[in-house]
Amino acid sequence: SELGADIRMISKSTYEIDTSRINCTEVSNELSRQMRASYYFLGALLGRFGSAQVAMPGGCNLGPRPIDQHLKAFTALGADDSVEYGMIRVKADHLQGAHIFFDTVSVGATMNAMLAAVMAEGQTILENVAREPHVVDLANCLKRMGADVHGAGTDVIKIRGVKSMH
C-alpha cells in the first residue's frame, strides 16, 4: 500500500495486513480524496505514532462529514488538533485514557476514538457511542491484535490501553 503496509490475500474473504513497515504519519491528499473515510487513519496513526495528518475525506457525495466529535475524542485523549487548508492534523506527546461522552452518536468518531484509545495509557470510557455491527467487528479485530476492549455493541465502550499490539 502507499503507506507501506504489505497486504496479502489469504482467501476470498480473508486478508493478512502487515503494518510493521509503516513509518509515515501523513496520508497524501491524493489517497485521502479517493476514500470516503480517510479520517480513520487519524486514530490509527495517532495511537501508533503520536501524530497524523490526513486530508479531509472524499470519495462520494453522501454529504458533509463533520469531524468535530472525532477531534473532541482526540483532544480528550491529550492530542492537539488543527484543520487548515483541507488538512486535519493531530499530535500528542502522550495519549492518556479519558472519559468521553459523544454529543451525537457517530460511527466514525466511535471507531476513530477506539483506534487511538487502544494505545493510550490507562482506561478510556466512551459513552453515547455507535452500536453498529462494524463497531463490534472493529472491537473484535482490535482484541485479536492484543487490545483490551469491552462493551462494543452497547452505548458504553471501555478500553484499557496497551503498550503494543500485533
Features from the language model and the residues they span:
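Structural preference for solvent-exposed beta-strand-turn elements
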Residues: 1-166
